[in-house]
A protein has these predicted regions:
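Charge-rich, well-structured scaffold segments of protease-associated domains
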Residues: 7, 15-18, 62-217, 228, ...
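A generic structural signal for residues located within well-ordered alpha-helices
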Residues: 40-44, 98, 119, 250-253, ...
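N- or domain-start disorder-to-order transition segments that initiate the globular core
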Residues: 1-24
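M16/MPP (pitrilysin/insulinase) zinc-metallopeptidase core fold and M16-derived inactive scaffolds
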Residues: 21, 26-90, 264-280
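A conserved active-site cap/scaffold subdomain adjacent to cofactor or substrate pockets
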Residues: 247, 253-266, 270
Length: 400
């Protein structure tokens, strides 16, 4: 594998990783802007842009976009997160130029016709309704709200239904003009790709995109709190979040290992103690989410109403115990899981393109796989205990 990056004159970064023995290419544009860059007034616009990107440009209708990609057997998709937005395609290697052309078209010449806007507003409102009927979605949205109350990072990615219903096309144009600038976009491809050819495509299709200043985001502070909601359900859905670490913290990798020890699989402490030993739940897991300046460490479980009083103390006790008695065999097992996951992801060009893009947006560079493995291997028992202590005593928790 050969990984390369070139920065165009306007600031747009072009990244590629050429892989031997493959016939396909995954290519996408990642934008350093997501839901946390919204205001209360335009909450939901980043997600609406993701929906509207495929609904027509100056030269292509929504049907044209779908037909062109699917006529060559390609797959087109997008997603919105709190910090980033991505638009990506997977195609046969000979169709890379078509993919870049379509990506450039939808990101620079989308028309956001009112008829399409009206239909897509209705679709997103249905998506919001479906989310509100899905306990897993509700619990994590409410947890985010109480973790970061009255802050952009705490607001829903989908936005409120009433805000979406009133959102006009000018809101989308304004958000794109402010945030979709060359210095905040990167074009990334992995698979059967020639870097020089990709750079030439980027120059031709994105070279006139204006550089633009980097828009500062509202710094977030984890504050904690509680959200309770009664519904007619079979289970109590419980989630606990604690202040955690940003991407650039020295304990970022120890936190990933610690999370795996605590709730990262069937051998994890939470799974063994809560499910296997006590039978208190079917689903229990934890994960660490890092942002640019902060983070959240989350534990989730679903249980019966009669069991929640026993479940919560057990979860809290397991979290607290980890800072004092994390064992070397647990650390070894967690490191092996993380290393295996890292190496297995290399087998997918789409996963690899995603990794390279995210690393560049977050760290400003592509991290060699060998370095990732070294950093995981460097995490020892003392580091896991230390980071468990940092997180468990880091501040007021959030509960939903």
């Amino acid at each position: 594998m050969t990984t390369q990056m070139t920065t165009l004159a306007n600031g747009l970064r072009v990244i590629s990783e050429s892989r031997d023995g493959v016939q396909t290419t995954a290519v996408g544009v990642w934008v350093d802007a997501g839901a946390r860059y919204e205001s209360i007034a335009n909450n939901g616009v980043a997600h609406m842009l993701e929906h509207m990107a495929f609904k027509g440009t100056d030269s292509r209708s929504a049907r044209d976009i779908a037909v062109e990609i699917e006529s060559v057997g390609g797959h087109l998709n997008a997603y919105t997160s709190r910090e980033h937005t991505a638009y990506f395609v997977r195609v046969l290697k000979e169709d890379l130029a078509l993919s870049v052309d379509i990506l450039a078209d939808i990101l620079q010449r989308s028309t956001f016709e009112e008829a399409e806007m009206a239909r897509e507003r209705a679709v997103v409102i249905q998506e919001i309704g479906q989310s509100e009927d899905t306990p897993d979605d509700i619990i994590f949205d409410r947890l985010q709200e109480v973790s970061f109350p009255n802050q952009a990072l705490g607001r829903s990615i989908l936005g409120p239904a009433e805000g979406v219903a009133a959102m006009g096309r000018e809101v989308l144009f304004d958000f794109m003009a402010e945030h979709y600038t060359a210095s905040r976009l990167l074009l990334c491809a992995a698979g059967a790709v020639d870097h020089d050819a990709l750079v030439a495509m980027a120059e031709a299709k994105f070279g006139n995109l204006r550089p633009g200043a980097h828009h500062p985001f509202e710094a977030a502070v984890f504050k904690g709190g509680e959200s309770r909601e009664e519904r007619e359900l079979e289970q109590v859905h419980f989630a606990l979040a604690l202040p955690a670490l940003p991407y650039d913290d020295d304990d970022f990798y120890p936190m990933q290992v610690m999370s795996t020890v605590l709730g990262g699989g069937m051998s994890s402490r939470l799974f063994q103690e809560v499910r296997e030993k006590r039978g208190l739940c079917y689903s229990i897991f934890c994960f660490a989410t890092s942002y640019k300046e902060c983070g959240a460490f989350t534990i989730y479980a679903g249980t019966g109403a009669d069991q929640v009083g026993e479940l919560v103390p057990v979860i809290c006790n397991e979290m607290l115990r980890l800072s004092g008695d994390a064992a070397q065999d647990e650390v070894n097992r967690a490191r092996a899981q993380l290393k295996a996951g890292t190496l297995m992801s290399l087998e997918s060009s789409a996963s690899r393109a995603e990794q390279l893009a995210r690393q560049t947006l977050v760290f400003g560079r592509q991290i060699p796989v060998e370095e990732l493995i070294e950093r995981i291997d460097a995490v020892d028992m003392a580091a896991v205990r230390r980071v468990a202590g940092r997180i468990s005593s880091g501040g007021e928790p959030a509960v939903a």
